[in-house]
Amino acid sequence: MSEVGIQNHKKAVTKPRRREKVIELIEVDGKKVSTTSTGKRKFHNKSKNGCDNCKRRRVKCDEGKPACRKCTNMKLECQYTPIHLRKGRGATVVKYVTRKADGSVESDSSVDLPPTIKKEQTPFNDIQSAVKASGSSNDSFPSSASTTKSESEEKSSAPIEDKNNMTPLSMGLQGTINKKDMMNNFFSQNGTIGFGSPERLNSGIDGLLLPPLPSGNMGAFQLQQQQQVQQQSQPQTQAQQASGTPNERYGSFDLAGSPALQSTGMSLSNSLSGMLLCNRIPSGQNYTQQQLQYQLHQQLQLQQHQQVQLQQYQQLRQEQHQQVQQQQQEQLQQYQQHFLQQQQQVLLQQEQQPNDEEGGVQEENSKKVKEGPLQSQTSETTLNSDAATLQADALSQLSKMGLSLKSLSTFPTAGIGGVSYDFQELLGIKFPINNGNSRATKASNAEEALANMQEHHERAAASVKENDGQLSDTKSPAPSNNAQGGSASIMEPQAADAVSTMAPISMIERNMNRNSNISPSTPSAVLNDRQEMQDSISSLGNLTKAALENNEPTISLQTSQTENEDDASRQDMTSKINNEADRSSVSAGTSNIAKLLDLSTKGNLNLIDMKLFHHYCTKVWPTITAAKVSGPEIWRDYIPELAFDYPFLMHALLAFSATHLSRTETGLEQYVSSHRLDALRLLREAVLEISENNTDALVASALILIMDSLANASGNGTVGNQSLNSMSPSAWIFHVKGAATILTAVWPLSERSKFHNIISVDLSDLGDVINPDVGTITELVCFDESIADLYPVGLDSPYLITLAYLDKLHREKNQGDFILRVFTFPALLDKTFLALLMTGDLGAMRIMRSYYKLLRGFATEVKDKVWFLEGVTQVLPQDVDEYSGGGGMHMMLDFLGGGLPSMTTTNFSDFSL
């Protein structure tokens, strides 16, 4: 009875019993193998202690150190990873039993276990092993180390030499037998409650939480037992208080015979006696309350622990978020400081350059000082932008500093309907930005593209200066001031003045104040006399107004005009300009003049600029309408008037006019470059503040820059081996693509815009030609035999939208705005088709070759009528496959703006036409 009680109590207080799996082993050739194993690996244990390579290959390992033979033969790195058995609840315990030749069974439960498992074996397992080895029962259970007086006397009477000769196993077995006898005697004397009764079994868990009794002699133990028996009859009315530890909890009972708490932790050896005391076992309602309080206490501790963990996690997240924000702010500050330092270095370099005209130097410095706050304001606007555009602005700042973090094109393309995407997104190397199709993101991309274009022009201008030096005096025109009755030579254009405009107003000021006593060459007179500068600007405004009212040229230049001009058409044009000037002079008041004076400080206009503006109003705009780029009311009336409100449009207009005039006049190449740079610089600021008011000005500037880039594609004006207009043979693609980003930024246009219908794509009529029976579009007619096998086009074809747009281009070849539609086709590519093209799809490449033939044929056909297409026809080869290193793929990557000018290896000048 006592042995059964000990076994039941052992099951109650120990961990849940693990399942045992007995594996019977036999000896074969001196090795122990399992009798149930099958297959070719029957006579080994599948390298359970072998190296990692043999375990992975499931082959036998000789377990050689430092490297096994198989790893040595295969030249592999041999590693031995320690075995970590899973300590899961209810795990299976494998017990190996060896059957000898005589039929007897030998237990090997601890032979094959790793050292870490042997250390984790409980005292119960040690006792069981010892008892099994001696043929005893497996149901032994260790009790307290304290024994009765009679037992201690019997142990002391044993011979000393027997103790010395005992092995550790026999000593453990003897101690177990003695403890077993002591437990039998104890329960026979104090067995008021059956050991297997429900009261005793249910109290097993709480018994572990009771404070242990210190081990001592048997007399003290009996005294404590008697005192506790006396206290058992008294009702326990005192409530139990919850505490942090079980010792504090159960130590709160005010019992006279309660032993003092010990400093060491509880163990089986020092707490078993106190656990088995009868008076320590609660019963009835008190026991239920104790269990409930204990459960509530455990839940409270668990909740507190979860709250502490949650607070720590939230604190860690806040710290990480603060660190990320701080790092981003530091990076932006570093970018801003580095950018400002570069600007300061540019200012210092320009101040150190020799300049004979001190007034011009002072005017340049004043202009750059005014540009400083504007650049700071732009940086502050970037810092105050929302989180959706933070990464785009940061990349824009990096690009302005020359730190390119992108391996492909920096310009997004506008898909059908104005959907913004780029090559990084297609190739999966771009971090997604929230609301990537927002107006702010498009504006940032356009500003970045304009910054790259401006940087490209500045580098080209600097290279021209290094290789060819400054232009000679004979290259610059010498205008005369008819209004003042005297002549003065304008300041010679310098290639180093790439960012600032040429011929500052201070030179005109000296012409107008030649008879005055104040010397304009004195720096103090230029810096301190602000009113004098305002007067000079006002004189310039009056001069402009007088030129428009009287239609008399104020600048006399040596020009070689064509002699076959139609006098009647010229007089009609003059009358129209006079009428427009009269209307503007009547409607313009004092406020408009003040506005012109304020805007003139951003872009200085000299007499050469007046000539260029007059040339546009008389000669250039008819060529634009002849190319069917919108109607005459836009380019003749609307654009010149709008240019006085937006300096970036004025500079773009003057650059295009200078390009047209440079075909017949020399010495204007530097003016083309300077006005183009000023237009790009001011456009970078304007695209960050897109509104409905400046939309038309931005679109007009983009269209003019596209036409100017096409006109300068061949790089006609050259000195030595360098192009004076700073355009490389393949750079026109780069600038056409960059200017197209402005159209992407302002897309979609408002219906009140003058350019509402320009380069629009309407594919809504495709729904009327769909054949539902065969699932194809039968109205799309093949216009190129090289892609005839792609027709009819299925509804699920990835080429559907692209072929539909090409079909509309082919049909509308003779309609208006076709030139802009055909050159902006890459900006309207379907996203799916663009992905196929970037991955080298043959069908997509064939379609782009067909488009190239359409582009080449149109440019060749109209080059005699449209002057700014003459340069394009000179750089486009006859066949797209003439490109070196891959043919059409390189050409289309160039035209799509895939990293130009850094990525492209194509040089158009290498091809002979």
Curated annotation (Swiss-Prot):
Q: Which residues cross the membrane?
A: none
Q: Which residues form a coiled coil?
A: 303-346, 440-472
List every position bearing Phosphoserine: 519
Tell me the superkingdom of the source. Answer: Eukaryota
**A Pfam family matched in the record:** Fungal_trans_2
Q: Write out the biased-composition intervals (Low complexity).
A: 222-241
| Keyword Membrane among UniProt keywords | no
Consequence of substituting residue 888 to D: In upc2-1; increases aerobic sterol synthesis and uptake. Also increases aerobic expression of DAN1 and sensibility to NaCl and LiCl
| Stated induction or repression of this protein's expression | Induced by anaerobic conditions, hypoxia and cold. Repressed by heme.
Region of interest: Disordered: 103-173, 216-258, 347-385, 453-489, 552-571
Q: Please name the InterPro entries in this protein's record.
A: Fun_TF, Sterol_Uptake_Regulator, Zn2-C6_fun-type_DNA-bd_sf, Zn2Cys6_DnaBD
Q: Which GO terms describe its biological process?
A: cellular response to hypoxia; positive regulation of ergosterol biosynthetic process; positive regulation of filamentous growth of a population of unicellular organisms in response to starvation; positive regulation of sterol import; positive regulation of transcription by RNA polymerase II; regulation of transcription by RNA polymerase II
Give the range the annotation lists for the signal sequence: none
**What are the Basic and acidic residues biased-composition ranges?**
150-164, 454-468
Role this protein plays: Transcription factor that is involved in activation of anaerobic genes such as DAN/TIR cell wall mannoprotein genes and YML083c. Appears to bind to anaerobic response elements (AR1) with the consensus sequence 5'-TCGTTYAG-3' present in the promoter regions of DAN/TIR genes. Involved in sterol uptake and regulation of the sterol biosynthesis. Binds to sterol regulatory elements (SRE) with the consensus sequence 5'-TCGTATA-3' present in ERG2 and ERG3 promoters. May be involved in down-regulation of CWP2 during anaerobic adaptation.
This chain's protein is named: Sterol uptake control protein 2
Q: Which gene encodes it?
A: UPC2
